[in-house]
Amino acid sequence: MADPKHQYTAAVVTVSDSCSRGEREDRSGPAVSQLLEQFKFSVVVREVVPDDQIQIQSLLIRLAREARLVVTTGGTGVAPRDVTPEATAAVCDRLLDGVAERMRSEGLKKTPFAALSRGVCGARGQALILNLPGSPAGAVESLQAVTGLLPHALDLLIGKTEHT
């Protein structure tokens, strides 16, 4: 359940073979969690999962029932085991292409490699699933690019459609 000072719940998933095996410390998940807390999200779950599409899909389905926002970090590039976008698209009812486009657009201002990110954003029921790059800086910068959109998108998903 969300802390009273927080309006929305969030789950953070680090997708990384090496982190899931304990060979590397997860730095992206904690960085993303910290930023979400600053924006008044209550991070209720943090998980680390290997780059396995079926495992990612199963986890996203479960977390979309537990949190309004599910943020993944990692597995969005072009390497053979980067399957986070495929897993996300497979479990979403609708994709929000503009959100991913905004993240890439902002990322391109810092590095040309942002063009290689295949991250997507989509809705599953009343939850939003957002893919971020695996590097701590890339994950934080991508999330910062869309934090202003998230509350409105989450409100729309529960039917709050009044416009002021």
Predicted regions and their residues:
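Non-catalytic beta/alpha edge segments that cap or flank active sites
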Residues: 1-164
